[in-house]
Amino acid sequence: MRTRLTDRTRRLAAALGATACVIALASCSTESSPESSSPTSSAAPSESGAGTYLALGDSVPFGFRGGATADFSDAANFVGYPELVGEELDLDVVNASCPGETTASFMDTKAQSNGCDNSLQSGFGYRTAYPLHVLYESMDQSQLDFAVDTLTENEDVELVTLQIGANDAFICQQTTPTRCSDPADLQALAQTVQTNIDTILSTLRDEAGYDGQIVVVTYYALNYSDAFGAATQEIGDGIEQVAEANGADVADGYEAFRARAAEVGGDSVEAGLVLPNDVHPSDEGQRLLAEAVLAVAED
């Protein structure tokens, strides 16, 4: 069990930006072709002889960062914790994550996402405008379908991670009168996330026949001292129960940031773990998430 990252690995982490930034930028960008850059990995078997690590999820594992300096036309510019974990474990990374993915759009590309295939505000989809780290067979292939195909076609997958659900919360905030602060809305959100993650994990186990290690990564709180921070923990607890029911391990992203945030009153931004005016981890935040995965990864 590895729990520490090498200095070389630490330097690979990249800061991330807000999903709203990329939606705004992409709407007026001329570099909108997903073929403008080759994917950095694919579902093909490892050519190096090392095992494969399949990373699934949203903008956090994707390595998303926004802002005017981000080059969205080249997926290699975006590095998340899966690349840190892959280097530490000497595994080839197949990172199928998509910024803005929800638990529903993970299974069905026509379901509501928060910027992966579509968005509430503009209908913009990141994967229709810019390349991901992998090349999907078509725009209709969901991330779950990609995962099932990868697992059934390749026998060398040693690790799968899944981090999904935060964009469900952002959708809830945008579509409910109380911005998802009402207990009934929070309960409905938690139930939806748990039900969909249960379906995702059971599909990986049963349809794909994968019996290797799956690690579900829970989310950090933006602020551990406010009500939504407490709700993040409650949702994470529910995700943990679903993970365990499907024979998956849990990397506790909530606890990964908690102690450092507590030193500055609970604010993950003030602690340097989340980028200012953003929801995505800084390079240090990505490093802590990688260490959370490594803490439960099997040698």
Task: Set out the residue ranges of the language-model regions.
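Bacterial lipoprotein signal-peptidase II cleavage site
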Residues: 28-38
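C-terminal motif of bacterial Sec signal peptides marking the signal peptidase cleavage site
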Residues: 23-27
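Active-site segments of SGNH/GDSL-like serine hydrolases
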Residues: 163-168, 177, 200-233
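Serine-esterase "nucleophile elbow" of acetyl-processing enzymes
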Residues: 40-118
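Structural recognition of the beta-strand scaffold that forms the well-ordered cores
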Residues: 52-57, 61-63, 92-97, 158-163, ...
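Catalytic His-Asp segment of secreted/periplasmic serine-dependent ester chemistry enzymes
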Residues: 219-299
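Bacterial N-terminal signal peptides that target proteins for export
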Residues: 2-16
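Oxyanion-hole/transition-state-stabilizing segment in secreted/luminal serine hydrolases
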Residues: 62-66, 115-187
